[in-house]
Design a protein with these regions (language model features):
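A short, N-terminal "cap"/entry segment at the start of jelly-roll beta-barrel domains
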Residues: 1-29, 42-43, 112-116
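Glycine- and acidic-residue-biased ligand/ion/polar-headgroup-sensing regions
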Residues: 48-50, 54-60
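Short acidic-glycine-tyrosine-enriched beta hairpin
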Residues: 67-83
Length: 116
């Protein structure tokens, strides 16, 4: 896999059931996403910011690299992905999963990983 160009807005790159921005300030933002059982946030990383995932409803599976791990989260649980660490987010259950993503501190970018 190789890096693609970094983008400032990833909302058009993958489909979700629902997406809402709860707060956005320079260097920090909070988003809420709802993904269906077959949906995912594709492999990507951020150069400057960390992602903190917090599950509200359903189950979430997060796959990360360097080192390779699989994290399973249920409501009330959270996980932090450091800057530069590639990750993939999938629904870990049979129903929709709703979660918050706290992103910061720094300038937002989304670098998708693509197959060679």
């Amino acid at each position: 896999m190789s890096d693609s160009k970094a983008v400032k807005d990833s909302s058009g790159l993958y489909e979700v059931e629902r997406r809402a921005r709860h707060a956005e300030r320079p260097g920090f933002r909070i988003s809420e996403l709802q993904i269906g059982p077959k949906q995912q946030v594709p492999w990507h990383y951020h150069n400057n910011i960390q992602d903190t995932f917090y599950v509200l409803e359903g189950r979430l599976r997060i796959f990360v690299r360097d080192p390779k791990e699989e994290i399973q989260l249920e409501p009330g649980q959270s996980y932090v992905v450091r800057p530069g660490r590639a990750h993939l987010v999938t629904n870990g259950g049979e129903t929709s999963a709703t979660f918050l993503v706290l992103q910061g501190i720094g300038e937002y970018d989304y670098v998708p990983l693509v197959n060679r």
